[in-house]
């Protein structure tokens, strides 16, 4: 990322609605197909955060602004993906390595971790 005025690198952030997955030939493919993630209109695979925002309800802002956060490096999902309930309590946490999920944790709306059977 280019440095900001104070010389630090600023991380890119976008919304999923502005992202697309492309195959090796540059064709847009489905979400589950093989390919790299790009911000629409960009030539290079995306590096940065992708966030989902909770929408206002009944004209009031949401209690918690985000419903998920994902991290991408050179078009591949990496790091921790976190999903939240509208209250701000954690709903799910997925850990990615090279685009593959390597671990997952889930919580109920009260914040209790759900155990796998």
Language-model features and meaning:
Residues 1-117:
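Glycine/tyrosine- and acidic-biased, solvent-exposed loop/turn segments at the edges of beta-strands
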């Amino acid at each position: 990322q280019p440095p900001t005025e104070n010389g630090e690198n600023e991380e890119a952030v976008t919304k999923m609605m502005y992202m697309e997955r492309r195959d090796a030939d540059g064709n847009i493919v489905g979400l589950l197909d093989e390919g790299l993630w790009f911000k629409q209109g960009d030539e290079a695979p995306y590096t940065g955060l992708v966030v989902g925002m909770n929408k206002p309800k009944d004209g009031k802002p949401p209690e918690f602004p985000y419903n998920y956060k994902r991290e991408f490096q050179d078009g591949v999902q990496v790091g921790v993906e976190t999903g939240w309930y509208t209250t701000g309590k954690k709903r799910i946490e997925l850990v990615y390595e090279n685009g593959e999920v390597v671990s997952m944790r889930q919580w109920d709306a009260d914040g209790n971790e759900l155990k796998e059977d």
